[in-house]
Amino acid sequence: MKIFLVFLSVFFFNGCFGLVYKTPISSSPISYDPYTTPIGSLYAEKLKENPNHSAAILLEDGFDALLHRVGLIRMSQKSIDMQTYIYKNDLSSQVIAKELLNAANRGVKVRILLDDNGLDSDFSDIMLLNFHKNIEVKIFNPYYIRNKGLRYFEMLADYERIKKRMHNKLFIVDNFAVIIGGRNIGDNYFDNDLDTNFLDLDALFFGGVASKAKESFERYWRFHRSIPVSLLRTHKRLKNNAKEIAKLHEKIPISAEDKNQFEKKVNDFIDRFQKYQYPIYYGNAIFLADSPKKIDTPLYSPIKIAFEKALKNAKDSVFIASSYFIPGKKMMKIFKNQISKGIELNILTNSLSSTDAIVVYGAWERYRNQLVRMGANVYEIRNDFFNRQIKGRFSTKHSLHGKTIVFDDNLTLLGSFNIDPRSAYINTESAVLFDNPSFAKRVRLSLKDHAQQSWHLVVYRHRVIWEAVEEGILIHEKTSPDTSFFLRLIKEWSKVLPEREL
């Protein structure tokens, strides 16, 4: 007990104040005309015809999303800015780290901003990149305690700060191209995980929306809670491993055959990209992002405001895909009002068996049956979704991670924003509202395809049940499918937690 009290006293009087200082100003971003870069020159003529428009390529497939990131890095000439919530130290992440290193070696300036919650370890490959002269790495809102196993003490002592995370996801290349959506960096976001793969969606945008995303990145990069790796307590130990940066190419666990196949796919992507062979959509794109100051003080979410406005203005249909769905009473009233007007409301979210957050599902359950009885089409992902084969291997589980909304087959809201209190009031988020009917229809068809292979919740004999088609036969479940009694019990216990804190 005495040792525990000593630890707490050291933590309170040292740890709690360990990161309250002014972060040194890092180097200023280089200035250049993005339209003169190799990527920018491809679309300069078309986009300059209408400066208010942006171009977009939809990234539905996970592996294709990885190819786009790697290909863009290889085509980069001036700068790369990456902002993400999670960066895992696995195969996909190591591939991207290696590509960023190669880009830096040829003079590209690279800046990487990671949320501390999503960092596997201070000794991940991505952290080693900070020792390259052309690469800077910062950690957003970091824990003072660097040992993950001991962080619960800091969470208890500094909960109000620690609970607020940077959930934004941006991948900006040469200030002209930006990937925005739900994907973090890790194997299960790129269909390369044996255990669980995330169903997700993002898009590659060119033009004006990229410059707005860049402005947002700058605000976060210079925010006082974005801490350089050099100021972390583990920096000295990390510096001892700096020599490992030269061995990144050797560390990637991939066979020569797989490497050759991957190289061919990347080269094929670059060739198709430069020949405009990917479907490209043009339209007005509005970039939306929270201020990083939301971490320190309550602020209205511009994404939530835009979502509610588009929802109220919908005339025909709304299709919402959100991995976490806790709408709250105010939004439920909006849903009810729109359904009463004849608007078709479709909702796709995780089931209890597919979710990675049981407590969130417990909160969602409070609204689920109400929405079904209101007349909404509610779908929950089956954890064996697609049962698809990935690179010769079967992943055992699928979970929805996307955050995408389509309004009237015209507007699409795409980004990191879930329909829940955490996205609205606690975390920081980023998204794009894109006005293009063809793009919206393509996204809706993708979501509809997901829904058709999911559980459909319907009212049967006055109760809500789950139904799905399996091998041409309609099947029904009266309790959460593919779950144990113990899992359902945990879900029930979780309902004592305050909804606003989830």
Curated annotation (Swiss-Prot):
It is found in: Cell membrane. It is a single-pass membrane protein. InterPro entries: PLD-like_dom, PLipase_D/transphosphatidylase. Keywords: Cell membrane, Membrane, Repeat, Transferase, Transmembrane, Transmembrane helix. The keyword Flavoprotein does not apply. Gene3D superfamilies: Endonuclease Chain A. GO terms for molecular function: phosphatidyltransferase activity. Residues 162-189, 396-423 form the PLD phosphodiesterase domain. GO terms for biological process: cardiolipin biosynthetic process. GO terms for cellular component: plasma membrane. The chain crosses the membrane at residues 1-21. Belongs to the phospholipase D family. Cardiolipin synthase subfamily. This is Uncharacterized protein HP_0190. It comes from Helicobacter pylori (strain ATCC 700392 / 26695).
